[in-house]
Amino acid sequence: MSRRHKAEKREINPDPKFGDLVVTKFMNAIMLDGKKSVAENIVYGAFDVVQGKSKQEPLTVFHSALDNIAPHVEVRSRRVGGATYQVPVDVRPERRQALAIRWLIAAARKRNETTMVDRLSGELLDASNNRGSAVKKREDTHKMADANRAFSHYRW
């Protein structure tokens, strides 16, 4: 890790269809091997399926899904006197969003539907209704932090 300069945040452009920066970040996270057009087709296709199934605006479903997945606290390892404690710490807003996007994509990839569009739309709908494995991951993270609340005085 460099001690001299902090890396600058890169500017990203909003996506062409909705004009939303979070959707662009989501597309970039889904993208494999630099194939952005494939990632766009997956995301926009999933949004179309979500709109057809839920009769709601896909962007609101997407944002509510991310809000339901994003963790508020997580545990970090802290070594104190030969023992390693799992210390609960609050999650910064940028990290909350990044974790939510990462967990949503991982949960969608593990699903059993045939195409990624179906998997992603199913996980988005589940997450917006507080179901699904991405929401379970958030609950597990919160339980872990709650169980280790006794070590919260080791924060840094």
UniProtKB/Swiss-Prot annotation:
GO biological process assignments: translation
GO cellular-component term (any): small ribosomal subunit
Keyword 4Fe-4S: no
Cross-referenced CDD domains: uS7_Bacteria
Record GO terms (molecular function): rRNA binding; structural constituent of ribosome; tRNA binding
Key words, A-Z: Ribonucleoprotein, Ribosomal protein, RNA-binding, rRNA-binding, tRNA-binding
The keyword Lyase is annotated on this UniProt entry: no
Short name of any one Pfam family annotated for the protein: Ribosomal_S7
SUBUNIT field: Part of the 30S ribosomal subunit. Contacts proteins S9 and S11.
UniProt family annotation: Belongs to the universal ribosomal protein uS7 family.
Record function comment: One of the primary rRNA binding proteins, it binds directly to 16S rRNA where it nucleates assembly of the head domain of the 30S subunit. Is located at the subunit interface close to the decoding center, probably blocks exit of the E-site tRNA.
The protein's name in its UniProt record: Small ribosomal subunit protein uS7
GN (gene name): rpsG
